[in-house]
Amino acid sequence: MSSSRREPPEAPSIDHLVVADWLGQLQDASFDRAGPAVRKAYPPQRRMTGQQLASYLLRRTYALASSTRPDGRAHAAPTLFSAYAEAFWLPTVKDAARIAHVRAHPWLALSILEGEHDTHAAVLIEGPAEVLTTVPEDLRHITELRNRGGTIAWAAYWLRITPQRLFSFAEHAWQEG
């Protein structure tokens, strides 16, 4: 087993079934609206189930966030993230470039990947985003636990993504692992 497939960090109890149901429904709706090329690239037998999505996203703590610079050029950077209240939340330092990017183009994409070749898996999420200065205390606590108990006092801003699309892909060996 690859080292990236470790146990999830301890976190407050979350209604795993509710999260799994939300993610599964979001993915189903995304594929219903997707074109034939996307449906062919992500065949049903390679998609994660709602339960697999919930477990995977709880276990993975970092994503690649893609935004658009004010001048239209692409920008990507790794970020800590948490799923909370049917949204994805990114704690962000005060002077992070993505703050200006989201204010200019309020949309983000997240890519959460692991493994290689026969054991790789990916979740792609995109949707409108907004910049916030305050978040629920539960979210701060969850995110600190996901950050291995490290403080997130550095988070001057939070980006909240309300996902409109979610696609997943998992090779058979990943699904069997």
Question: What is the role of each PLM region?
Answer:
Residues A37-R69:
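Short, conserved active-site entrance elements at the starts or edges of catalytic domains
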Residues K94-A96, P106-S111, L139-G149:
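Short acidic (Asp/Glu) patches
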Residues M1-M48, H117-G177:
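Charged, gly/pro-rich active-site loop segments
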Residues A96-R98, Q175-E176:
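Short, surface-exposed beta-strand-loop junctions and turns on beta-sheet-rich folds
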Residues A63, F88, L108, A129-E130, ...:
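Short beta-strand segments in beta-sandwich/barrel cores
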Residues R60-K94, L110-L113, A121-L124:
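Short beta-strand segments
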